[in-house]
Design a protein with these regions (language model features):
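Short amphipathic alpha-helices and their capping loops
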Residues: 1-55, 81-124, 202-258, 477-478
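Acyl-thioester-dependent acyl-group transfer interface
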Residues: 1-49, 53-58, 62, 296-362, ...
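Active-site-proximal acidic secondary-structure segment that organizes catalysis
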Residues: 2-10, 124-127, 131, 138-140, ...
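Gly/Ser/Thr-rich phosphate-binding loops and adjoining beta-strand/alpha-helix segments
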Residues: 24-31, 36, 58-78, 144-165, ...
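AMP-binding/adenylate-forming domain of the ANL superfamily
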Residues: 34-52, 128-133, 177-178, 257-273, ...
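Short amphipathic alpha-helical segments
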Residues: 76-87, 135-138, 181, 275, ...
Length: 479
């Protein structure tokens, strides 16, 4: 679905209703014994980072969410039961953490104790006022350092309702939130007809956390994966990679506010042609990374583009429907200055991804611990990313535009560029959080315009009238 923020997801006035975990369930959780299943390394890193940044005097909301419509007069009882039924499928949403000294201990609420409290907040006639209220509420409730850390809302009108749901990132990734609209619609439609659908619980992310952590803890500092990360970080001057263009930031300065840039890059026709061109090398991800390496070389002049590429870790079908944070990262180095043409860049990226993708299975937080690296976080983002996701296969994706379905990002503070390129049925969409400086805006604007130009040039090089069946230096100028 299209990635955006709460300000740009077509919020309309109406009656606001909220659902939160019932206070009785919250009280029950306080007396629960420890759950022996540990946090995933990525969860622990996220929560410790939030604590470190908070202790530094800055509150940095980092929640994710989704927005979508339910057409027609809405049955709030059926919607509440749909939300509860969906939540019961995903164990991580009733599992949280508490501190025991400096250790994180998990607790998990029994499914039988899960209930939601509905509260009618009131009528909002001004969309801007409603947006500010929703953002403020999500900031407070969907917070890494509290539990429960999610909130469900609906803005009800005569002709339907808009649902807005927010979660701390420790429980969800982009794929998780993209699956939500279809699941809620299915459960709601059944409930509105008086049918209680029998759906088995999805694979538990809490179980995955234990499995992944057990495997990661068997690795020591002599492992080849750790050594490859060591070499990569050494070539990054002892740091994880930033987006290699000038962002107008002063060394040691305060964490800057961020802005959002989001737009469609190309339509479905050009997206399909770009994908077809890149398919022999591995597909659109390879093409986007190759184009990025070319563009940042043009802007920043660096001969090598180093980045950490996000990959999902749902390698077993058991986890395909599961809500959780199933993401790892693989180090990639692209020697842009050595490439005589775009095809050479594609081959370089393809080779790098094949060689390094398996490294994403090892949690980076575990690697850093084994390296003895003191990455005391001062920013919610340890490194910059350029992510690519093909979302067309997600259930319900063909209705996302009709249902005004969006994936929501909280844009607050950060010194990194985090960019997402999403393949939708209607084309390629770009969204990015970036530091709010004039220099960063200028350079990111230049990056996006050049990314569009490269994609279009590649796509149209093989269309009738194109000068060549392959994109070479005749179509795309390499420095």
């Amino acid at each position: 679905m299209r990635m955006t923020d709460i300000q740009r997801c077509e919020v309309r006035p109406g009656l606001l209703v909220e659902w939160s975990l019932d206070p009785a369930a919250v009280r029950a959780a306080t007396g629960l014994p420890d759950d022996s299943r540990p946090p995933a390394y990525i969860q622990e890193s996220h929560i410790r980072t939030a604590r470190s940044v908070r202790e530094g005097g800055l509150f940095v909301p980092t929640w994710l969410g989704t927005a979508f419509d339910i057409p027609g007069r809405v049955d709030l009882d059926a919607l509440q039961e749909a939300l509860r039924g969906w939540m019961l499928r995903h164990e991580t949403l009733r599992s949280g953490f508490r501190w025991a000294g400096d250790d994180m201990r998990r607790f998990t609420l029994d499914a039988a104790d899960v209930s939601l409290r509905r509260e009618t907040i009131g009528e909002f006639r001004d969309a801007d006022v409603l947006v500010r209220y929703l953002q403020d509420r999500f900031d407070v409730v969907a917070d890494a350092l509290r539990w429960p850390n999610f909130l469900y809302t609906a803005v009800v009108r005569e002709d339907g309702a808009s649902v807005y749901m927010a979660f701390d990132h420790s429980n969800v990734d982009a794929y998780s939130v993209q699956r939500i609209p279809a699941e809620i619609h299915e459960l709601y439609a059944a409930g509105a007809r008086g049918i209680r659908p029998e759906r088995e619980p999805a694979g538990s992310y809490v179980d995955f956390c234990r499995t992944e952590r057990t495997s990661a803890d068997e690795v020591d500092g002599t492992d080849a994966v750790v050594e490859r990360w060591r070499e990569f970080i050494d070539r990054c001057d002892g740091r994880l990679p930033n987006f290699p263009v000038d962002l107008g930031l002063k060394p040691g300065g305060r964490l800057p506010r961020q802005k959002l840039m989001r737009e469609m890059l190309v339509d479905a026709e050009d997206a399909a042609a770009f994908e077809a061109y890149c398919r022999p090398f591995g597909g659109s991800l390879v093409g986007v990374l190759a184009a990025t390496s070319l563009i940042v070389h043009e802007i920043g002049g660096r001969p090598v583009y180093r980045t950490v590429v996000p990959f999902h870790t749902r390698r077993n079908s058991r986890w395909l429907e599961s809500v959780g944070w199933y993401v790892g990262g693989a180090p990639v180095e692209i020697h842009t200055a050595r490439a005589p043409d775009f095809d050479s860049l594609l081959r370089t990226v393809s080779t790098q991804l094949r060689a390094n993708r398996s490294l994403a299975r090892m949690p980076l937080a575990r690697v850093l611990r084994l390296l003895g690296s003191d990455f005391r976080p001062t920013s919610p983002d340890l490194y910059s990313i350029v992510s690519f996701v093909d979302a067309r296969g997600i259930p319900g994706s063909e209705r996302w535009t009709e249902l005004k379905a969006y994936g929501l990002l909280r844009v607050s503070y950060g010194d990194q560029v985090c960019a997402w390129v999403t393949r939708l049925h209607e084309g390629l969409q770009f969204a990015s959080r970036y530091p709010d400086t004039d220099v960063a805006h200028k350079n990111l604007r230049l990056y996006v315009e050049r990314l569009r130009e490269v994609i279009v040039s590649v796509a149209r090089s093989q269309q009738p009238g194109g000068s060549s069946g392959r994109a070479s230096s005749a179509q795309i100028t390499l420095p």
